[in-house]
């Protein structure tokens, strides 16, 4: 199912709002949407909400044989799925261009940046290593999928615990969580993607674009960075040309946003760990606020209405008057008038239908009698079967008879007179029969 395209009015409205440095949800140009992180009952399961965009992250592991060229390193695998539950435009089981681009960007952001120590995932060199699989499911799409997916992936990896193992000779022993505590992954840093949307060929910039803003943007710049201000990857799409100063400015903004998001992630991990140690309630069910009626509500957007009247007066004063202004009504026909800029009014003349309506309102209900028409070939007298002239009234139920002239009007006259005499003779015979019967 294809997505519903934006109308021209919506597109112009969005672009006009961006030019005035306003956004539909009330944010400023460099503001991020609210980020909410909730953890499941198992380690390595989390849901990240970036506004209305929701991504579910799940990490799993298994012992496999290593790659031939990297015998002492573990394997990282990332998989992002776009289901129709998130948006009707996504087709299940099909590798779209958007899905391929997002998966490659996640691999460059997390795997190529060496954020996880893959050598610590080795159990037996050349024989057994841990394969870490990160599955990401998009639950709801409201724009900026890559930022929400990168946050969900790194949060799930930080929250994940793998089973402990021991090696004695050639025997590898795998312990359950009851026998030994699971072991967390060795993470060097936390790279996070920050997206920048450009409009009007790079003139205007927005951070964290939503779904509607992504439809009207000209290009997208994604910068993956950690809290140490180290750029892990950078990608530009959309075919726009960016200046060096624009890229530097975006990198500075990304550094500030990444530091804030990293602090939020660390606090969420610490709170979850504290609740688990204290034996409190945790999981997705506990993170839903079910005691509030307005748990799911639209955030209010403040609007400044202080200078609306002054602005309206300025617009009226700056507006240019039309070239020709008519201050008095222009009489086109009797009973009509027009006040405007002097353009000829095509509605000035009364039409036939309006004349008929006026005659009906005035009480003129006289019948229209068709007179004998005079043709070039001769005169034709239109007489009915009983010698009475044909009368057309205003009633819509009666049939209308259209008389067409013939080539020989004298023959038509003779035929009509013969038809009139014939029924008169028949009527006389009927009267005689009635008298004899009596």
Curated annotation (Swiss-Prot):
Keyword Acetylation: yes
Gene Ontology MF term list: mRNA 3'-UTR AU-rich region binding; RNA polymerase II-specific DNA-binding transcription factor binding
Alphabetical GO biological process terms: nuclear mRNA surveillance; nuclear polyadenylation-dependent rRNA catabolic process; positive regulation of cell growth; positive regulation of transcription by RNA polymerase II; RNA catabolic process; RNA processing; rRNA processing
Residue list for modification N6-acetyllysine: 297
Biased composition annotated in UniProt, kind: Basic residues: 427-438
Record cross-link Glycyl lysine isopeptide (Lys-Gly) (interchain with G-Cter in SUMO1), residues: 297
Cross-linked sites for Glycyl lysine isopeptide (Lys-Gly) (interchain with G-Cter in SUMO2): 297
Keyword annotations from UniProtKB, A to Z: Acetylation, Cytoplasm, Exosome, Isopeptide bond, Nucleus, Phosphoprotein, RNA-binding, rRNA processing, Ubl conjugation
The keyword NADP appears for this protein: no
GO cellular component: cytoplasmic exosome (RNase complex); cytosol; exosome (RNase complex); nuclear chromosome; nuclear exosome (RNase complex); nucleolar exosome (RNase complex); nucleolus; nucleoplasm
Subcellular location: Cytoplasm; Nucleus, Nucleolus; Nucleus; Nucleus, Nucleoplasm
Role according to the record: Non-catalytic component of the RNA exosome complex which has 3'->5' exoribonuclease activity and participates in a multitude of cellular RNA processing and degradation events. In the nucleus, the RNA exosome complex is involved in proper maturation of stable RNA species such as rRNA, snRNA and snoRNA, in the elimination of RNA processing by-products and non-coding 'pervasive' transcripts, such as antisense RNA species and promoter-upstream transcripts (PROMPTs), and of mRNAs with processing defects, thereby limiting or excluding their export to the cytoplasm.
Similarity field: Belongs to the RNase PH family.
Quaternary structure annotation from Swiss-Prot or TrEMBL: Component of the RNA exosome core complex (Exo-9), composed of EXOSC1, EXOSC2, EXOSC3, EXOSC4, EXOSC5, EXOSC6, EXOSC7, EXOSC8 and EXOSC9; within the complex interacts with EXOSC3, EXOSC4, EXOSC5 and DIS3. The catalytically inactive RNA exosome core complex (Exo-9) associates with the catalytic subunit EXOSC10/RRP6. Exo-9 may associate with DIS3 to form the nucleolar exosome complex, or DIS3L to form the cytoplasmic exosome complex.
Name under which the protein is recorded: Exosome complex component RRP45
Source organism of this protein record: Mus musculus
Gene encoding the protein: Exosc9
């Amino acid at each position: 199912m294809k997505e519903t395209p934006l109308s021209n009015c919506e597109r112009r409205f969005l672009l006009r709002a961006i030019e005035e440095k306003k956004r539909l949800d009330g944010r400023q140009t460099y503001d991020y949407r609210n980020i909410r992180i909730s953890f499941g009952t198992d380690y390595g399961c989390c849901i990240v909400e970036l506004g209305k965009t929701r991504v579910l992250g799940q990490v799993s592991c298994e012992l496999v044989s290593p790659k031939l060229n990297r015998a002492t390193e573990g394997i990282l695998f990332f998989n992002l799925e776009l289901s129709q539950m998130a948006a009707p435009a996504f087709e299940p089981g099909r590798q779209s261009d958007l899905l391929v681009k997002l998966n490659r960007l996640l691999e460059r952001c997390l795997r190529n940046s060496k954020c996880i120590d893959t050598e610590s995932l080795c159990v037996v060199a050349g024989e057994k290593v841990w394969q870490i699989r990160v599955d990401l499911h998009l639950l709801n799409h409201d724009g900026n999928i890559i930022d929400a997916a990168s946050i969900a992936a790194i949060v799930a990896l930080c929250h994940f615990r793998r089973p402990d193992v021991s090696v004695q000779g050639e025997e590898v022993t795998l312990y359950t969580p009851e026998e030994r505590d699971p072991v967390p992954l060795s993470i060097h840093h936390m790279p996070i993607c920050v997206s920048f949307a450009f409009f009007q060929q790079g003139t205007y910039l927005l951070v964290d674009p939503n779904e509607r803003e992504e439809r009207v943007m000209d290009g997208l710049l994604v910068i993956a960075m950690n809290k140490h201000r180290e750029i892990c990857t950078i990608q530009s799409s959309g075919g726009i040309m960016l200046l060096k100063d624009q890229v530097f400015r975006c990198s500075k903004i990304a550094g500030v946003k990444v530091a804030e998001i990293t602090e939020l992630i660390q606090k969420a991990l610490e709170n979850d760990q504290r609740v688990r140690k204290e034996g409190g309630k945790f999981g997705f069910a506990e993170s839903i606020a079910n005691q509030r009626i307005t748990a799911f509500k639209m955030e209010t957007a403040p609007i400044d209405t202080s200078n609306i009247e002054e602005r309206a007066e300025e617009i009226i004063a700056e507006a240019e008057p039309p070239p020709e202004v008519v201050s008095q009504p222009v009489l086109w026909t009797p009973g009509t008038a027009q006040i405007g800029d002097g353009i000829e009014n095509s509605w000035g003349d009364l039409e036939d239908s309006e004349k008929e309506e006026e005659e009906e309102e005035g009480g003129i209900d006289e019948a229209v009698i068709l007179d004998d028409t005079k043709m070039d070939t001769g005169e034709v007298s239109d007489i009915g079967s009983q010698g009475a002239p044909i009368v057309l009234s205003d009633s819509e139920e009666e049939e209308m008879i259209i008389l067409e002239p013939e080539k020989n009007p004298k023959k038509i006259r003779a035929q009509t007179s013969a038809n009139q005499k014939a029924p008169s003779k028949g009527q006389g015979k009927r009267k005689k029969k009635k008298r004899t019967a009596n």
